[in-house]
Regions:
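Residue-level signal for short segments within beta-strands and strand-turn junctions
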Residues: 77, 93, 156-158
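A short, acidic/glycine-rich surface segment
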Residues: 92-98, 162-163
Length: 175
């Protein structure tokens, strides 16, 4: 009886020790793989010859509500349908330097969660980092390059502040 009890105790102790060791060694790695990196499209930016005419064309033919920055699409977040989300659409002058060092005529902005952690992770993975994180009332921004030389803007949005800024600028969203 004592032998069976000792064997059972050894098995339970080994299991607990192994579980504890596994938790210590792999803490955060499971969280990283479960971390949702991109949550949606934050913006679509492209170069054109005449941004003003381009905005007018989209307004006249496709019903966009445009201002000097382009247009904003308003939608509801899937994880919480009471929260608004926004996607910016903006034509830029063909001479803009904003997309550099990319030579492409477009840039996509991705909405992300926890930009600081994502940025550290991307650095560790060897992704080309173009700048440091910039903070604004309406969110945090950083830029990276993908493997084909496309500049990517990462945005951790503060949608409430973004909406407030839009109202101050007189923007009307597309719903």
């Amino acid at each position: 009886m004592k032998k069976q009890t000792l064997i059972a105790l050894a098995i339970v102790t080994s299991f607990c020790f192994g579980f504890a060791l596994n938790s210590i060694l792999f803490r955060g790695k499971e969280e990283t793989s479960k971390t949702k990196k991109v949550t949606g499209i934050g913006g679509i930016f492209f170069k054109c010859k005449d941004p003003k005419k381009m905005r007018e064309w989209y307004q006249n033919h496709l019903g966009f509500n445009t201002n000097q920055y382009g247009s904003v699409f308003e939608w509801r977040q899937g994880s919480d349908s009471t929260k608004k989300g926004f996607t910016q659409w903006s034509p830029f002058s063909e001479t803009t330097k904003y997309f550099e060092p990319s030579t492409k005529d477009f840039m996509i902005n991705y909405r992300v969660e926890n930009l600081e952690n994502l940025f550290k992770q991307l650095k560790n993975e060897g992704v080309t980092i173009l700048d440091s994180i910039e903070n604004y009332d309406y969110g945090k921004f950083a830029h990276i390059m993908d493997i084909e030389g496309n500049k990517i803007e990462l945005w951790e949005p503060n949608d409430a502040a973004y909406e407030k800024l839009g109202i101050q600028l007189g923007s009307k969203t597309i719903k």
